[in-house]
Amino acid sequence: MLVLGLETSCDETGVALYDSERGLLADALFSQIDLHRVFGGVVPELASRDHVKRMLPLIRQVLDEAGCVATEIDAIAYTAGPGLVGALLVGASCAQALAFAWDIPAIGVHHMEGHLLAPMLEENPPEFPFVALLVSGGHTQLVRVDGIGQYELLGESLDDAAGEAFDKTAKLIGLNYPGGPEIARLAEQGVPGRFVFPRPMTDRPGLEFSFSGLKTFALNTWQQCKNAGDDSEQTRCDLSLAFQQAVVETLTIKCKRALKQTGLKRLVIAGGVSANKALRASLEDMLGSIKGNVYYARPQFCTDNGAMIAYAGCQRLLAGQQQDLAISVQARWPMEQLPPL
């Protein structure tokens, strides 16, 4: 089955072609970072308009790269949520229109299920069951995964997601959008130990997260430095390192608890923050200490992309899942509501 995947949940337009027998044939992405940077964050209306502009050229691009024609496509998968409603509607409308014109099925895919399954595109994919850490700008969740659609939420953030905390903290100390990569870059030059941040909710049982306090701690620390006349680049580096260490150690502690609670030794990390090198290194060390394994997608598939949507949609279509031509998207969509395969 040859599936065209469309991703438009936020500020990246992703298109890919995935074949159930040959694997990923082509993948293209247009990022709107430059468009939104001047505003310090994503402007939903601008995101939607840019998706409209980029979608059809990217579809033509992946068809050319794969050496395919439209008549060879068996189905279309598109992101139906969660995300920005206007942006989601661009992908959904395009998918359903093409599906109607080409007389093929279209299926809406859960954005975070796409992220969760992205490591399945790698040469050494994880086997079920496993624990997944979904960590992005909008989500921080620990999930037990027994199969596609078989999800048990173990814990999640009570306030800011980890990626959101990265971006907000970066903005507070004067870094460019998107803030996560900027903090990671500066952290490489930071002096360990100059600042010590708390590890929120690690001193009590449970698998919930809270990152809003770290953002406040960073702001107060930065203001103290500025009041003392020290708002140098090195101070930004030191603060970035301390903040990143706090987030990474908190995530690692909770992942270790989740593995112990479930009795599993396979961990998948997915979502934009899973590209963070410090987080990967910390989780690899932790899994090594318990003789377990950690899995993640290549960096280009950690952020939003069409390949993960094409793959997830293909699995559900092969299992016989069907959908009518109604255009329906959801800004919020608990993953536990998905039907199991």
Curated annotation (Swiss-Prot):
InterPro entries recorded: ATPase_NBD, Gcp-like_dom, KAE1/TsaD, TsaD
Physiological role: Required for the formation of a threonylcarbamoyl group on adenosine at position 37 (t(6)A37) in tRNAs that read codons beginning with adenine. Is involved in the transfer of the threonylcarbamoyl moiety of threonylcarbamoyl-AMP (TC-AMP) to the N6 group of A37, together with TsaE and TsaB. TsaD likely plays a direct catalytic role in this reaction.
Domain of life where this protein originates: Bacteria
SS bond partners: none
Gene this chain is encoded by: tsaD
Record-given protein name: tRNA N6-adenosine threonylcarbamoyltransferase
GO biological process: tRNA threonylcarbamoyladenosine modification
Cofactor note (record): Binds 1 Fe(2+) ion per subunit.
Membrane-spanning segments: none
Locations listed in the record: Cytoplasm
Pfam family, one: TsaD
UniProt keyword annotations, A-Z: Acyltransferase, Cytoplasm, Iron, Metal-binding, Transferase, tRNA processing
The protein's required cofactors: Fe(2+)
Residues binding Fe cation: H111, H115, D304
HAMAP family: TsaD
EC id: 2.3.1.234
Enzyme class: transferase
GO cellular component terms attached to this protein's record: cytoplasm
GO molecular function: iron ion binding; N(6)-L-threonylcarbamoyladenine synthase activity
Family note: Belongs to the KAE1 / TsaD family.
Catalytic activity: L-threonylcarbamoyladenylate + adenosine(37) in tRNA = N(6)-L-threonylcarbamoyladenosine(37) in tRNA + AMP + H(+)
Residues involved in substrate binding: L134, V135, S136, G137, G138, D167, G180, N276
